[in-house]
A protein has these predicted regions:
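Intrinsically disordered, low-complexity protein-interaction/activation regions
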Residues: 1-133
Length: 133
């Protein structure tokens, strides 16, 4: 069976006309632009959900990746760089996976997600997108 489950069918009444980014066990239910997709859970999808829940907020990659320096661990600057790389790679991988299924959603995410030392979801205020989680 294909690891990425793509479902194009009539949407359940509960999500019709809505945008959904919701974890359901080992999968994520993603609905955007009338298309329903179920993707296996990944760290990148978790990071994206975290950002989508905080539109307009800059989230430090260290917080997003859960990288907290520990005594005897790498210096804070090294931990911050590792977190930045981990967050960026994970988010890009998740976006690539989404892009193979839903062109309108990946176009939206490419225009609104930034990664780096700080990561953010910054939707255009003139084109609001509401999400259910």
């Amino acid at each position: 069976m294909n690891e990425d489950l793509k479902t194009r069918r009539a949407l359940p009444g509960a999500v019709a006309g809505r945008n959904v980014f919701r974890r359901e066990g080992e999968y994520w239910m993603i609905v955007y632009d009338g298309e329903l997709h179920r993707l296996p859970d990944t760290v990148g999808l978790r990071y994206l959900a975290h950002l989508l829940q905080r539109p307009g907020q800059q989230v430090p990659a260290v917080d997003l990746a859960g990288a907290v320096p520990t005594p005897g661990g790498p210096p804070r600057t090294a931990a911050a760089e590792l977190a930045r790389v981990k967050a960026t790679r994970s988010i890009r991988a998740a976006m690539h996976r989404i892009g193979t299924h839903n062109a309108p959603l990946i176009a939206h995410l490419r225009a609104t997600i930034t990664t780096g030392t700080y990561c953010a979801y910054t939707p255009d205020p003139r084109l609001p997108v509401g999400w259910e989680f």
